[in-house]
């Protein structure tokens, strides 16, 4: 390609492109062709930069090589970069370092920074954090924005220098003010965390916003986080979703996952679960563990996609391979239940242990349950209690309830109803329905606490309104008998109905009694018999006995001594 340069001897504009009407540097209108003999090193650097921008890497390498041969520092640096990236030449870190060192010795700031990077990461030279910081410092003295940012990172982390967050903030600020986007991002984080400066969410958001204006994916994502959580601005779900989408379109996996959550839940956008699955999939395929987990849940539950245990197991396994605690837990549950995989409680235990080792209380609780039942492990109440206690002390409500039950019935510990009530209370305070019901039982009968029937009813109601069948039955009984509340047969029958339809055998029995006696409902012996039979099939002895009486007395048709005897025997 033919070379032309500006006729003006003071102007060094040179190009292989089509000759412009006017020189972009001096405004001159005349250009001269060149065979290269009249060009100086700086001209070859300019031509190399032009060739590199055009993607003509072979030409760029040749141009930079000419400049470097004349000892031009910029040419040496750019030739070193070609060796680093393998553009126009075979990639070679040692050659890159050699050229960076030559240029750095002449004071070229870019080369000094590049050489520092090589030392920091051991590219072409032995790793040497102190040498890295020293070269970053040389370049930073010349106000090179990238070097200022790199040196700031060293001061942030104490890499090659003593940690000095305040100095880091100073350097990030200089670099950010010069327009270096990574420095803007890092400075925002320092303000957000209050490291090296007073915590200032407004300043953090301002710097993230400036970086986001340059389409920096991570900064866009962080803006989304700030608007979602109300850091430095009022909570704005719609604006958060906009930032997530912009970052997601740049293929930033965490943003893809967060935008998917917005779509799945309808937070800040119109709910669209199938589209959420598409975004989860994009992030999951990039290896984002949280997205892999969320995608697995979608496949397990059939949310936004047809239910598929195979895909659920695949994505739980992918996230578990990255040691995501919740994925380890859910995959363990699949193995424990045989959902989508062959039932394998031993494998479940291994997965639960990996999750528990990362501090996941729910996993400790599952381990406790395996030992309680002797499922895949030798049955051991003391071991079960130990795991329940670890999870309970971490504030996990189901484990607190389980530990309370162990104390109430003396399983793995000495029976202690007061301790039982304490642990039930901790779980009940978190709104855990089973614990509310158990604590209600304690108050109804004065077990471990002073008898307080109104408090019992209050707790039963809280659990019953969450749909717990046992609590619905207990509330129905209190309402029927006027225990801790005014007697109300109709309300009692309604609570028994809910309990019975929820599959609780005692609720079925009590509902049958209502129909037998006309308590709160119209007397109906046929319905009474149906509910007694359902309760009996669930294994409730009282229902079996009642059916025996009915068949013996002929309440449900002709007397049938054989049927009566069969139910009595059961």
Predicted ranges, named:
Residues 3-8, 20-21:
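Residues immediately within or flanking Cys/His clusters that coordinate Zn2+
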Residues 14-22:
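Short linker/helix segments within small regulatory modules
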Residues 39, 69-73, 85-87, 92, ...:
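Short helix-capping/linker turns of helical repeat alpha-solenoids
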Residues 27-36:
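Short Cys/His-rich micro-motifs in 6-15 aa windows
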Residues 7-15, 27:
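Cys/His-coordinated zinc-binding microdomains
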Residues 44-51, 78-85, 114-121, 150-157, ...:
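Hydrophobic face of amphipathic alpha-helices that form TPR/SEL1-like repeat modules
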């Amino acid at each position: 390609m033919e070379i032309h340069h500006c006729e003006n001897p003071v102007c060094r504009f040179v190009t292989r492109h089509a000759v412009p009407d006017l020189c972009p540097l001096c405004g001159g209108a005349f250009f001269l062709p060149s065979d290269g003999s009249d060009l100086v090193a700086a001209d070859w650097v300019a031509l190399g930069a032009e060739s590199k921008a055009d993607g003509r890497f072979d030409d760029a390498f040749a141009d930079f090589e000419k400049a470097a041969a004349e000892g031009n520092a910029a040419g040496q640096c750019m030739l070193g970069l070609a060796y680093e990236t393998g553009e126009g030449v075979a990639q070679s870190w040692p050659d890159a370092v050699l050229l960076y060192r030559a240029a750095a010795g002449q004071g070229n700031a870019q080369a000094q920074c590049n050489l520092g990077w090589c030392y920091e990461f051991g590219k072409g030279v032995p790793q040497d954090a102190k040498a890295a910081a020293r070269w970053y410092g040389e370049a930073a003295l010349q106000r090179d924005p990238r070097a200022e940012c790199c040196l700031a990172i060293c001061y942030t982390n104490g890499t090659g220098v003593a940690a000095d967050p305040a100095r880091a903030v100073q350097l990030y600020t200089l670099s950010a003010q010069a327009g270096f986007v990574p420095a803007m991002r890092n400075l925002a984080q320092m303000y957000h965390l209050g490291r090296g400066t007073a915590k200032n969410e407004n300043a953090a958001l301002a710097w993230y916003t400036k970086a986001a204006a340059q389409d920096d994916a991570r900064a866009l994502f962080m803006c989304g986080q700030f608007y979602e959580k109300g850091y430095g601005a009022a909570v704005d779900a719609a604006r958060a979703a906009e930032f997530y989408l912009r970052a997601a379109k740049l293929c930033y996996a965490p943003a893809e996952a967060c935008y998917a959550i917005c779509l799945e839940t309808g937070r800040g956008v119109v709910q669209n679960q199938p589209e959420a699955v598409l975004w989860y999939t994009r992030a999951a395929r990039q290896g984002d563990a949280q997205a892999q987990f969320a995608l697995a849940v979608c496949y397990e539950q059939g949310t936004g996609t047809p239910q598929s245990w195979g895909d659920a197991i695949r994505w739980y396994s992918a996230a578990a391979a990255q040691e995501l605690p919740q994925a380890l837990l859910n995959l363990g549950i699949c193995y424990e239940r045989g959902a989508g995989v062959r039932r394998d409680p031993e494998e479940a235990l291994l997965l639960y242990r990996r999750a528990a080792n990362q501090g996941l209380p729910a996993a400790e609780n599952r381990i406790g349950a395996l030992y309680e039942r002797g499922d895949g492990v030798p049955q051991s109440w003391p071991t079960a209690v130990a795991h329940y206690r670890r999870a309970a002390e971490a504030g996990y409500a189901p484990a607190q309830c389980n530990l309370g039950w162990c104390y109430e019935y003396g399983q793995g510990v000495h029976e202690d109803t007061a301790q039982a009530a304490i642990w039930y209370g901790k779980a009940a305070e978190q709104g855990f329905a089973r614990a509310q019901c158990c604590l209600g039982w304690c108050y109804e009968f004065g077990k471990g606490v002073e008898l307080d029937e109104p408090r019992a009813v209050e707790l039963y109601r809280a659990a019953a309104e969450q749909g717990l069948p046992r609590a619905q039955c207990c509330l129905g009984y209190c309402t029927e008998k006027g225990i801790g509340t005014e007697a109300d047969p109709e309300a009692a029958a309604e609570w028994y109905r809910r309990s019975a339809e929820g599959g609780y055998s005692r609720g079925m029995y009590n509902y049958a009694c209502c129909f037998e006696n006309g308590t709160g409902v119209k007397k109906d012996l046929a319905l009474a018999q149906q509910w007694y039979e359902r309760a009996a099939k669930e294994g409730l002895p009282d229902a079996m006995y009642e059916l025996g009486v009915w068949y013996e007395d002929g309440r449900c048709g002709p007397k049938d001594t054989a049927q009566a005897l069969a139910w009595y025997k059961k």
